[in-house]
């Protein structure tokens, strides 16, 4: 049985482990329920599941990464993880152009979800840095794809949830860095209005910016948060640190299987209080490791188990600038419900890219974890969905596990354009997933 | 596909005019529900029931279904999947209670009731299970009865059909292990419904709504068997082991 990272709505599929040589055959022998490729299973909902059909897991080859130091271009196998990419690139003075909050995603998954990071307001999402893809099509042919060669298919694939074909290899532009450290400014902010104002004013001066919001705080503390902003450190800034390009993240702990739900109002409240209090009121120029700044949760293996057998949802949406009232309404509503787990993440997006299903667009994006077993969750989510959609916002498919086909149609007005491009690439409807069935993505 | 809150997209009630079946459909319907399909013998009654059903934004449909026409069942399930997509929850809610006195006077009528309650359920249950296995997900909810747990002389024809159904459903559930699909066997006690209208309530009587609430909870928890109310499990654990002479003299109808 397969689930996403949220451990909800399991379904059974024929899981086939393949390498590049056996991929085409495994896909061709899929039955009426179609096929899908799965990476590291970090999308939260049912995006990497295919109930009753074939799910292909592509093996990552041993020499899967080539860095061209004259151009800064990286060509890597789609099954290569960001963990492997960073271990290869950072000591050589390069960084991935965009990283999500975990390094345990594959390159293929990053393209399928068009992932974004703390630098979206400056650099856009991962697809903006992609130069070419090698893709297995539904008819068995392998095509070399660039934005120029087939813009329709290119942008349908970026953020296309793996439903246009199997990306086997991709080339992207890496970011030159001097060190493996980040220089970070931290500010503790007491309420929501101050947070939005501070972010709107100062974000442009930083490559990376994100705020962690305590969604259990209410009243005058509503939206109290810790804002961290920074950039890669230069060699000068890390003078005195040993080996400026050293990079070797380690696992610190693991959550064992079968733990009961540890997330309740008391535990979350205590955690958030501790976390808010321990943050400095204002700290400038702190040197942090890449792992601490970008991937703090990756040190704890299987942290998704702390929600017990019901699992959890990660609710992420974006509303355009100007819809701050809706954003505040959502935050207030979640705070009132008391269901939010740990700190939520608020981030300002820059403009989106041409991908019809690519999630980011200019505006505010908020991410909040909610235990799936919480009472009244269905009503809460419906209320939040209405607020988001009425404000012209939308939901992130890589996170979604609850919303409806109507919500997606409203949030992604170019869905039919994507469906046409997809249909051209796969008229026989080979590529399919549980999320595609649930949200009626394939027209 | 059901979502992370276990809200089904498509619900099918076999025996679509059954009070318990309708209550389960209403209780399971959420914001994500697209279709509620009532499969019943009498389409007109089903249409009226569909109109009265509170299922939010979901669309109610009525299709013809005859439990005793076992040859039609596989085709019916195929049609349902063709028309409504993956079947997330199928509720097997049909059944006839009949009258023990009538059955004893008319053995052919008894056989007809048993055919509907048991053979019909076997045939459509297998057809549904095949579909769910193909899908790799889905739940079949089977309305059994405590009447089948230890059969009473006052309604042993009905009770024996439910005993058979209960055993069949348990075996079917076991056969689906590892397929992604599963079976929930529901054993209600005496339920105040149109099936029991005019009869005196038995002790620990319950309502269709209470059965529905218990079913929703059990599906979320991934249970395989439930009793409604739950205390009946203990009561029947005792009843099952009473010596025959005592059981025959029990003052229960």
Protein language model features and the residues they cover:
Chain B
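Conserved glycine-rich cofactor-binding loop
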Residues: 17-19
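Conserved glycine-rich Rossmann-like NAD(P)H-binding loop of the short-chain dehydrogenase/reductase
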Residues: 32-48
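Rossmann-fold cofactor-recognition segment
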Residues: 53-71
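Conserved mid-core segment of classical short-chain dehydrogenase/reductases
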Residues: 74, 96-111, 154
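Active-site helix of classical SDR
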Residues: 125, 161
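Residue(s) in the substrate-gating loop at a strand-loop-helix junction
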Residues: 145
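C-terminal helical subdomain
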Residues: 178, 185, 200-237
């Amino acid at each position: 049985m397969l689930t996403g990272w949220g451990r909800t709505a399991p379904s059974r599929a024929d899981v086939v482990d393949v390498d590049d040589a056996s991929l085409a055959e495994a896909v061709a022998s899929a039955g009426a329920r179609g096929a899908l490729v799965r990476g590291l299973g970090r999308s939260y909902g049912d995006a990497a599941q295919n109930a009753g059909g074939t799910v292909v897991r592509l093996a990552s080859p041993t020499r899967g990464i080539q860095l061209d130091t004259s151009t800064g271009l990286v060509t890597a196998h789609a099954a290569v993880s960001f963990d492997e990419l960073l271990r290869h690139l950072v000591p050589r003075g390069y960084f991935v152009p965009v990283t999500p909050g975990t390094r345990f995603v594959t390159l293929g998954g990053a393209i399928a979800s068009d992932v974004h990071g703390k630098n979206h307001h400056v650099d856009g999402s991962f697809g903006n840095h992609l130069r070419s893809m090698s893709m297995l099509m539904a008819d068995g042919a392998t095509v070399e794809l660039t934005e120029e060669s087939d813009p329709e298919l290119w942008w349908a694939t970026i953020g296309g949830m793996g439903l246009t074909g199997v990306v086997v290899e991709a080339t992207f532009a890496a970011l030159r860095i001097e060190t493996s450290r980040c220089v970070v400014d931290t500010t503790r902010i007491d309420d929501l209005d101050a947070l939005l104002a501070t972010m709107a004013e100062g974000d442009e001066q930083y490559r990376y910016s994100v705020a962690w919001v305590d969604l259990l705080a209410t009243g005058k503390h509503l939206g109290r948060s810790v804002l961290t902003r920074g950039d890669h450190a230069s060699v000068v800034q890390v003078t005195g640190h040993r080996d400026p390009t050293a990079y070797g993240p380690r696992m610190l702990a693991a959550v064992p299987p079968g733990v009961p739900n540890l997330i309740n109002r008391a535990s979350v409240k205590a955690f958030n209080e501790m976390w808010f209090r321990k943050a400095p009121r204002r700290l400038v120029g702190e040197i942090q490791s890449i792992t601490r700044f970008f991937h703090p949760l990756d040190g704890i293996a299987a942290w998704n188990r702390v929600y017990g057998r019901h699992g959890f949802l990660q609710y992420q949406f974006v509303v355009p600038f100007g819809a701050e009232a809706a954003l505040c309404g959502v935050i207030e509503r979640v705070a009132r419900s008391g269901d939010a787990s740990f700190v939520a993440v608020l981030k300002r997006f820059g403009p989106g890219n041409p991908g019809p299903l690519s999630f980011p667009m200019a505006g505010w994006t908020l991410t909040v974890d909610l235990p799936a077993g919480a009472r009244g969750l269905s009503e809460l989510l419906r209320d939040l969905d209405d607020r988001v959609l009425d404000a012209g916002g939308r939901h992130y498919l890589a996170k979604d596990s609850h919303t409806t086909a109507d919500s997606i149609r409203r949030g992604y007005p170019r869905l039919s354009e994507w469906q046409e491009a997809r249909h051209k690439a796969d008229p026989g409807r080979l590529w399919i997933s549980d999320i595609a069935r649930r949200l009626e993505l394939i027209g | 596909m059901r979502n992370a809150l276990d809200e089904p997209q498509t619900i099918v009630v076999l025996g679509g005019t059954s009070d318990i079946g309708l209550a389960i459909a209403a209780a399971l319907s959420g914001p994500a529900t697209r279709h509620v399909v009532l499969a019943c013998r009498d389409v007109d009654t089903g249409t009226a029931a569909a109109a009265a059903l509170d299922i939010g934004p979901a669309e109610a449909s009525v299709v013809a279904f005859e439990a005793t026409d076992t040859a039609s069942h596989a085709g019916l399930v195929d049609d349902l999947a063709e028309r409504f997509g993956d079947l997330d929850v199928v509720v097997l809610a049909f059944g006839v209670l009949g009258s023990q006195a009538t059955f004893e006077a008319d053995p052919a009528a008894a056989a007809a009731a048993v055919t509907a309650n048991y053979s019909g359920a076997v045939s459509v249950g297998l057809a549904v299970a095949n579909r769910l296995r193909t899908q790799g997900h889905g739940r079949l909810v089977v309305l059994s009865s405590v009447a089948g747990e230890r059969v009473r002389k006052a309604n042993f024809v009905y009770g024996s059909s439910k005993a058979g159904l209960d055993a069949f459903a348990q075996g079917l559930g076991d056969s689906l292990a590892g397929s992604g699909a599963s079976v929930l066997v529901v054993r209600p006690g005496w339920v105040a419904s149109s099936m029991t209208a005019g009869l005196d309530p038995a002790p620990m009587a319950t309502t269709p709504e209470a059965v529905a609430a218990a079913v929703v909870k059990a599906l979320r928890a991934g249970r395989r068997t439930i009793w409604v109310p739950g205390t009946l499990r203990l009561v029947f654990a005792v009843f099952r082991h009473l010596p025959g002479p005592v059981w025959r003299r029990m003052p229960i109808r």
